[in-house]
């Protein structure tokens, strides 16, 4: 079976947006106009084809990125739906990693929201070119030009409108295409499937000319030949303008901007045209960086059918009918179902049972998958998110994804004995699907703790336990993941010697303990010279310290951001052993920590609250009571925006308090930002409670 769509006609795109900007509706309409779905699903009634997990249907928010294939004008579009809620940024990061381009959807009323900034930063981090779609132009308060301004101000980007709206709110009927200089008006009777191309209405001609001039100038800046032509007063052809927009979009010096109303079926076809005209094919993005596992040297993987198979597993889902699905982005070569792949991350071979092409809620079996495709593999047992699958003959490890540590933990207790066994298995499966979710056992109490990126994240996990795995569980109070660190440098010596008949134990070390930059982690430096400690015992000292740092001296929380230098010591020919040096390292670290001015750290959340002006004073007063530091106050569409850093421990139950303080008119979002020092009076309470 040969390739159906040439590589240069494939677009792997994601639709990324703030919650409620209308992302799922936009994905739905794309599937409708490209002929995949026959009845349009609305998020409001919980039937959208992209939102296929049950909890999403209830909450009306998109949680998992479903990958769907559709076709438009001889191009194949692989659509990856990304979640817009801040607790799920790990899902967004993960999909960004495998996209070639993105459509950023903004609400014409809400504009640039805090979550949009996070998603935008992630797209910058992974170098993903994007186009902007300003949605909901039919809503009261819709303002395309205000969103253009916010993208400049808040996202520091260079938005270049390639179409502008005709009318707004209930008079929004279509757009002016600034490339062709024509008006496109949608026909309400055909659910937006048909539209007419007309002359530009006279009252908008001036505005259209002004924006066309801006567009041409932005395009000319992309290419010297075009610049000369433009400065010489010559007209640029439509082809030249399109080429310039594409160049600027791919090198991210400009962001093409369009508008429409997905819900009212207007502007979706022009968006699809822009996807195939301006977003990159797999052949137009930079080669993917990887590491050769044998030599550890950097190698580049070129997107092409030639060469040995290489792909990245970016998502794992459990499907009730076929078991585990591993979503893979193929970068190079091709693979037939039933063949073996080599997991270079784990150094293991696995057999691919079936290859499935996903259409949001139905699936088709395919015989072979090619470069540039996104496909679900069935039958892989050991492959996890972020693993590389390739051909052993030309092995490569594609760059690893980095996953954040959880900031919140909740104890879960199974209700019955039967639930207990099922719960362990279920939590294991959920942790495989989602690397930002962790499961651990609390040593002192033997309770099972689950950790994640926020309350909603864990609520959904508990909900999935009940629904998908039929496990009934009670949950405890949320607990914050505190950390400890040190503030001063100390040198300490510890001699561990035991002589009590038979073979003794002897390990003797001198260490220097120093604080490091926040977020920089642990560092071990060996400065032993002249063999005062034999080199086979050095790793044991490091291991002893790493075990001891899991339980800090203040309250038993993990210790972070410090450097240990092992600079002297001694050993005994007969009595020294790895064990003795491990204990010596561990004891020396504990003694040094006590003397190094240890402090408690807590997760600080970046909180953005949006409230009507009359509640502003109450909200700020409340944030101050929660030990918040107010960073800025802005206006957005008649509402006040307060930005603050607030300790996570003070934010439990905030949504209820905010609702009652603002009569339901305030909204907020929060995400983990950094670890900050806990004030000493509060730290004292926490330590006493822990030890009590």
Curated annotation (Swiss-Prot):
The keyword Cytoplasm applies. It is found in: Cytoplasm. Catalyzes the GTP-dependent ribosomal translocation step during translation elongation. During this step, the ribosome changes from the pre-translocational (PRE) to the post-translocational (POST) state as the newly formed A-site-bound peptidyl-tRNA and P-site-bound deacylated tRNA move to the P and E sites, respectively. Catalyzes the coordinated movement of the two tRNA molecules, the mRNA and conformational changes in the ribosome. Its main location: cytoplasm. Coiled coil: none annotated. Belongs to the TRAFAC class translation factor GTPase superfamily. Classic translation factor GTPase family. EF-G/EF-2 subfamily. One of its GO terms (molecular function) is GTPase activity. GTP binds at residues 17-24, 81-85, 135-138. This is Elongation factor G. It comes from Helicobacter pylori (strain Shi470). CDD domains: EF-G (cd01886), EFG_III (cd16262), EFG_mtEFG1_IV (cd01434), EFG_mtEFG_C (cd03713), EFG_mtEFG_II (cd04088). Keywords: Cytoplasm, Elongation factor, GTP-binding, Nucleotide-binding, Protein biosynthesis. Residues 8-283 form the tr-type G domain. One of its GO terms (cellular component) is cytoplasm. One of its GO terms (biological process) is ribosome disassembly.
């Amino acid at each position: 079976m040969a390739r159906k769509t040439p590589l240069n006609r494939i677009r792997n795109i994601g639709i990324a947006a703030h919650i409620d900007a209308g992302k799922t509706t936009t994905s739905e309409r794309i599937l409708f106009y490209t002929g995949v779905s026959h009845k349009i699903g609305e998020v409001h009634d919980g039937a959208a084809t992209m939102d296929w997990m049950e909890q999403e249907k209830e909450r009306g928010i998109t949680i998992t990125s479903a990958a769907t294939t559709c076709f438009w004008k001889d191009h194949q579009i692989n659509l990856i739906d990304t979640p817009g809620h801040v607790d799920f940024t790990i899902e967004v990061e993960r999909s960004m990693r495998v996209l070639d381009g993105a459509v950023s959807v903004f609400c014409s009323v809400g504009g640039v929201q805090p979550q949009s900034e996070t998603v935008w930063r992630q797209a910058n981090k992974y170098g993903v070119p994007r186009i902007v779609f300003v949605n909901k132009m039919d809503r009261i308060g819709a303002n395309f030009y205000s969103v253009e301004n916010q993208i400049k101000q808040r996202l520091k980007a260079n938005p270049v409108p390639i179409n502008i709206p005709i009318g707004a709110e209930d008079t929004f009927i279509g757009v002016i295409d600034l490339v062709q200089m024509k008006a496109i008006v949608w026909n309400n009777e055909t659910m937006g499937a048909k539209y007419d191309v007309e002359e530009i209405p006279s009252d908008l001609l001036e505005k259209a000319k002004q924006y066309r001039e801006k567009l041409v100038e932005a395009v000319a800046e992309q290419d010297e030949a075009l610049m000369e032509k433009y400065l010489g007063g010559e007209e640029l052809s439509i082809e030249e303008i399109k080429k310039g927009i594409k160049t600027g979009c791919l090198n991210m010096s400009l962001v093409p901007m369009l508008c429409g109303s997905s819900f009212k079926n207007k502007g979706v076809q022009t968006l699809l045209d822009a996807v195939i005209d301006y977003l990159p094919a797999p052949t137009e993005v930079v080669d993917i960086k990887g590491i050769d596992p044998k030599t550890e040297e950097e190698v580049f993987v070129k997107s092409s059918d030639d060469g040995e198979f290489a792909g990245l597993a970016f998502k794992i889902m459990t499907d009730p009918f076929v078991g585990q699905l591993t979503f893979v982005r193929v970068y190079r070569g091709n693979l037939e179902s039933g063949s073996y792949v080599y997991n270079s991350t784990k150094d293991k071979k696995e057999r691919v049972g079936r290859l499935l092409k996903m259409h949001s809620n139905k699936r088709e079996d395919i015989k072979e998958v090619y470069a540039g495709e996104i496909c679900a593999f069935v039958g892989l047992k050991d492959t996890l998110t972020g693993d590389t699958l390739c051909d052993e003959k030309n092995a490569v490890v594609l760059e690893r994804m980095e996953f954040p540590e959880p900031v919140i933990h909740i104890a879960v207790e199974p209700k019955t004995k039967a639930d207990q066994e099922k719960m362990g298995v279920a939590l294991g499966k959920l942790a495989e699907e989602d690397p930002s979710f962790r499961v651990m056992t609390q040593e002192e109490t033997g309770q099972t703790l689950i950790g994640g990126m926020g309350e909603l994240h864990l609520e959904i996990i508990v909900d999935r336990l009940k629904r998908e795995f039929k496990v009934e569980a009670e949950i405890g109070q949320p607990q914050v993941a505190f950390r400890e660190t040190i503030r001063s440098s100390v040198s300490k010596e510890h001699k561990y010697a035991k002589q009590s008949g038979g073979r003794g134990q002897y390990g003797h070390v001198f260490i220097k303990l120093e604080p490091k930059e926040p977020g920089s982690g642990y560092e071990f430096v060996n400065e032993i010279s002249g063999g005062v400690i034999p080199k086979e015992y050095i790793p044991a000292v490091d291991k002893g310290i790493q075990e001891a740092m899991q339980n800090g001296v203040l309250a038993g929380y993990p210790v972070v951001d410090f450097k240990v230098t092992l600079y002297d010591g001694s050993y005994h020919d007969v009595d020294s052993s790895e064990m003795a040096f491990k204990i010596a390292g561990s004891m020396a670290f504990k003694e040094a920590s006590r003397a190094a001015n240890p402090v408690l750290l807590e997760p600080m959340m970046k909180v953005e609250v949006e409230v009507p002006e009359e509640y502003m004073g109450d909200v700020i007063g409340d944030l101050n009571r929660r030990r918040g530091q107010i960073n800025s106050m802005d206006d957005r569409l008649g509402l006040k925006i307060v930005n603050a850093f607030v300790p996570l421990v003070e934010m439990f139950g905030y949504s209820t308090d905010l609702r009652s303080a603002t009569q339901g008119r305030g909204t907020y979002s929060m995400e983990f930002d950094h670890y900050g020092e806990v004030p000493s009076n509060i730290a004292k309470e926490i330590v006493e409670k822990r030890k009590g």
